[in-house]
Amino acid sequence: MKRAVVVFSGGQDSTTCLAQALHQYDEVHCVTFDYGQRHRAEIDVARDLALKLGARAHKVLDVTLLSELAVSSLTRDNIPVPDYEPDADGIPNTFVPGRNILFLTLAAIYAYQVKAEAVITGVCETDFSGYPDCRDEFVKALNHAVTLGMAKDIRFETPLMWIDKAETWALADYWGKLDLVREETLTCYNGIKGDGCGQCAACNLRANGLNHYLADKPAVMAAMKQKTGLK
């Protein structure tokens, strides 16, 4: 039996990854992290979506200690989430240092326990927003370390790594989940479901990607299939 663990936030990217995993694996487990995030509403959204989509199990792990160590606008109410600035340079204040290191490591431990061969995460280098822990180089390096440290071949999969937001919408549509992802996921840094606040970087990337996809569905779908190898 093929098993996978999805790092699941209830947002656009991880929900699209879950939809695909459910077609590619016999048993899919979801793991969501409570790290004291500003947008904690995502935890309830993730719980509802995991149940609705048919995950074998959904585990919420308390890692609120991360918020004590990692200073970010996502872990501090007194640091405002910046509005979207397409030309901004450097690492944004929404970056939570160590978050994906912790999430992927804990997900791998969970995968070890449930005998899953893969940990799936929705990080993406094309739209990585300046986050160093969304890069392919980082994921592969951590995967190598985890494999050595556990003496277990647990594979980190990144289905969205080389596709952009428009193509991520196409992937959701390919699996018949476009409307669900559009209406029921939570990507917004300010914790607003669906279209979100419309001001933060997450909302703008999501909206711009959707508009691009809807404006040119055939071309975007074809590009997505070419990059992912889907037929």
From Swiss-Prot:
InterPro entries reported for this sequence: QueC (IPR018317), Rossmann-like_a/b/a_fold (IPR014729)
CDD domains in the cross-refs: QueC-like
Taxonomy, superkingdom: Bacteria
Pathway of action: Purine metabolism; 7-cyano-7-deazaguanine biosynthesis
Keywords: ATP-binding, Ligase, Metal-binding, Nucleotide-binding, Queuosine biosynthesis, Zinc
GO biological process per UniProt: queuosine biosynthetic process
Catalyzed reactions per annotation: 7-carboxy-7-deazaguanine + NH4(+) + ATP = 7-cyano-7-deazaguanine + ADP + phosphate + H2O + H(+)
SUPFAM superfamilies linked: Adenine nucleotide alpha hydrolases-like
Cofactor(s) in the UniProt record: Zn(2+)
Residues holding ATP: F8, S9, G10, G11, Q12, D13, S14, T15, T16, C17, L18
EC number of this enzyme: 6.3.4.20
Cofactor note: Binds 1 zinc ion per subunit.
Function recorded in the entry: Catalyzes the ATP-dependent conversion of 7-carboxy-7-deazaguanine (CDG) to 7-cyano-7-deazaguanine (preQ(0)).
Family affiliation: Belongs to the QueC family.
The protein, known as: 7-cyano-7-deazaguanine synthase
Annotated gene: queC
